[in-house]
Amino acid sequence: MNATTSAAAYGPLAGADLEAELAQARVADSDARDAAILEHDGSASVVPLARRRTSGTAPDDAVTLSGVSKRFGARTVLDNVELGIARGSFVAIVGRSGCGKSTLLRLVAGLEQPSSGALVTRGEGGGALDTRIMYQDARLLPWKTVLQNVMLGLGRGARDQARAVLDEVGLLERANDWPAQLSGGQRQRVALARALVHRPQLLLLDEPLGALDALTRIEMHALIERLWREHRFTALLVTHDVQEAVALGDRILLIEQGRVALDQAVPLDRPRARASAAFAALEDRVLKRVLAGGPGAADHDAEHEADKVRPVGQIRWAV
């Protein structure tokens, strides 16, 4: 199979210059059962570190890291990371500030190169893995309309395709508006549309909702989940918000001291019931594990730490 490595050229990264009710008794029984499973020590939902692949590449993996380390001068940010990301999966990465989450994302995006180890990406059919990235800042060009921002890098023949994607994110009626006329949540919807118009195989999300209010975040969660389920791209989300990780991911990775310290499956039905006992139990389990690392457990990322915007009063944020 033809594989591309992190040294191979990626396509342009959009955003870089740039979402039958069960009977109540059945719901309660299911929630209680799932919560009990999650609370049980040695739950099968937790993937033991020893079971993670240490060499080779599974044929269904879109991304594989084998012994990957990243150093900035004398500082080691990622240390011998072994990781496989299955094609079509939604993986959320959590951890304290500076643990290496964003560095890992930038390596996968090809914006940084590993100091050692191998990072392999595989597109469908063995070709290049078309990758797009979405940041906390929507990075829209203020002198271009919403539609023109979505069409960046595309020819005029893509107008209908861009309008269709704007319709998918609920902003078709704002196609001719300027970015300054939009709310923060609407601007992020445009950024999402700009990434999805290319129909990427891999979508990287670097804390894209961190600056939004709580209600808008929940609406964006529903939108992102719906589009992921429809298009089945591989998604890799970096977030400080453990609740967000449980809401969106089918797998949660905790980065601690430059390594994958926890690899947790999310055995919850979609769409996620945030008020369920199982959801709360899993959120609590992951949050406690994040906090157990201690405030001095991680070195700082060497890039864009000053760009982080962290809402105040989010009790489920691990910062």
Curated annotation (Swiss-Prot):
Q: Which SUPFAM superfamilies match?
A: P-loop containing nucleoside triphosphate hydrolases
What disulfide bonds does the UniProt entry report for this chain?
none
Q: Name one GO cellular component term.
A: plasma membrane
Residue positions binding ATP: G95, R96, S97, G98, C99, G100, K101, S102
**Per UniProt, what is the membrane topology?**
Peripheral membrane protein
CDD domains found in the cross-reference section: ABC_NrtD_SsuB_transporters
Q: Known InterPro entries for this protein?
A: AAA+_ATPase, ABC_transporter-like_ATP-bd, ABC_transporter-like_CS, ABC_transporter_ATP-bind, P-loop_NTPase
Q: Which GO molecular function terms does the record list?
A: ATP binding; ATP hydrolysis activity
Compartment annotation: Cell inner membrane
The role this protein plays is: Part of the ABC transporter complex SsuABC involved in aliphatic sulfonates import. Responsible for energy coupling to the transport system.
Know the name of this protein? Aliphatic sulfonates import ATP-binding protein SsuB 1
Q: Which organism is it from?
A: Burkholderia cenocepacia (strain HI2424)
